[in-house]
Amino acid sequence: MTRFAWVMATYIATLGVGLSALFHPVPKLIWNATASVPVGFYAVRPVGALRFGELLVVKPPEPLATFLDERRYLPKGVPLLKRVLALPGQAVCRTDRTITVDGAATGEALSRDRRDRPLPAWRGCHTLAPGEVFLMNRQSEDSLDSRYFGALPVTTIAGRADPLWTHEER
C-alpha cells in the first residue's frame, strides 16, 4: 500500500470514529429485564402512525431520566418499553389514584413503590395535544409509566418494540 493510501485509510477511519461520537444510533435489538412487559429480546422497528396498544421503545426525557436513575429504577441511557394508551385529542385524567381515558377507567396508580418511597402524582385532566402520547402498561400494576409522569412528547419515541423471544411467568 502506498503512503497516500495509508494516509487516506487513516483519515477515513478517524473520521468514522469521530462522527460516531456525534450520533447516537438507536439499537436494533434490545433486552428487556423489567417486569413491566415480558422479559426478553425485542427488535426495534421504525414507528409509523401510532396505534392504541402498540409497544414502544421510549428514551426518558429529563428530568424523568434523572429521577429513574436516582431511584435506581432504570439507569440513564436505558430505554423504557411502554404501550400506547391514549393519543392526541383524547382526555386523560387522574383522580386520586384512578386513571381514565375519555371517561373510562383504565387503571390505578400506586402511592408508594416497593421500597415504600412516595411515587410522583399528577392530578386533573389533560387533553393530549398533537405531539403527545400517554403510555401505560395496564397488565403490570407497578409499571412506572404515564400514570406517574403524565404524557410524553412523541420525540421521546425511539421505535416500536416487536418481541423476538420473551419469557412470561405463568
What are these regions, as identified by a protein language model?
Residues 1-170:
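Extended hydrophobic leader/signal-anchor segments used for secretion and membrane insertion
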